[in-house]
Amino acid sequence: MTPTYAPSLLDKLLGDADEAQRGVLARYSIERIKASVARDIEHLLNTHASFTPEELAAYPHAARSLATLGLVDISSLSMASDRDRKTISDSIRHALMRQDARLREVEVAVREDRSATAKLSFSIRAKLMLHPHTEPVAFDAVLHPGSQRYEVGAA
């Protein structure tokens, strides 16, 4: 029998109305869980933090609040600079480690993109914590510099 898992809180809140009306307890396949995580990562990366945790260091509760949800502003960084690309990938990794408790051992790397389009691609690898198991996951993230928007999908 293929294992199934309980959906995340967000999936429960946004869940299937038909299942809720029938009183069905939703169980997701690993593929559906991974798709849900990809969606959540995309939402997180497209959210801009009001403050960095460092700016709120004197206020530890605020530093762990929604005020720091998302990524810091990267609009002043150059996509052509290796140092700035590392800064962006580090920012993604820190945001995922700090703000998604389901993910452990998060690694983010810039991928070389040979296409003619102006975009920056990342590879995200982590371990997804699914009680009582862990599942290795991999996602591709693409930053479109003009809009500063990310797209995330399964690798």
Predicted regions and their residues:
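Immediate N-terminus of the mature polypeptide
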Residues: M1-A80, M129-A155
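A cross-taxa feature marking solvent-exposed loop/turn segments within ectodomains of secreted
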Residues: A101, T117, P132-T134
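Charged, glycine-enriched surface loops/patches
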Residues: L120-P132
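Hydrophobic residues positioned within well-ordered beta-strands of beta-sheet architectures
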Residues: V106, F122-I124, V137-F139
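Beta-rich nucleic-acid/ligand-interaction surfaces
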Residues: R111-F122
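Acidic, low-complexity glycine/serine/threonine-rich segments
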Residues: T68-R98, R102-E112
